[in-house]
Amino acid sequence: KNRVPVVMIGDGSMTAGMVYEALNELGDLKYPVVIILNDNEMSIAKPIGAISKYLSKLLAGKYYQGFKGKVDKFIKNNMPEGTTYIAKRMEEALKLITPGILFEEMGIDYIGPIDGHDIDEIIDTLQIAKAMNKPVIVHARTVKGKGYKIAEGQHEHWHGVGPFNVEDGAFVKKEAPKAATAVFADALSSLACKYDNVVGVTAAMPCGPGIIKLMDKFPVRFWDVAIAEQHAMSHIHI
């Protein structure tokens, strides 16, 4: 059957090592699959690390695909017979300015960035990706909370929400005992004040468990390792 698997991953999750283990294997097997990279410049909290910076740089190359197509066409139509070597070198030189060179060097084609809110562009791009019949990453830029201005401006607070007032975005407060995360945050902060060897490590979630209180008080004793839980555990022992 003419089916191509489609998987989706967020830019925040691109900091996890397992992603590159999978891409490494996929680039070798050349199995046809479309990977949608949903890039909203957010994980849960503000993304950090080299991969996040790399994805941001890709935005500077948003017009690259059209440019590359023109160069490829020029090489095909204008290079005479017997100049295959020169054409190949030109193609390799072009790769030096490829925004998706990280993925292409792993054997995975790259398309993008595209507007993740433009349905027509998404459909056209996915059809192109499917027809390529090999592993390809479609880099889609999106805005978290798109369509609701209040959420667009407060990404972290609107990652997961309960009841709220649509008009002003105010959350409906309920009488409830102190949350376990709040108890943890207070205890951690108190211990950190008492012992200078108490540190905090989080995997892109400083607010959820309340560890942000430690970050505010003792920023040099706090690390956010992005969405990389395995690394977080090994980082603790450094």
For each of these PLM feature ranges, what is it?
Residues 185-207, 212:
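Active-site diphosphate/adenylate-binding microenvironment
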Residues 3-6, 33, 134-142, 198:
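Generic beta-sheet signal
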Residues 1-38, 204-236:
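Thiamine diphosphate
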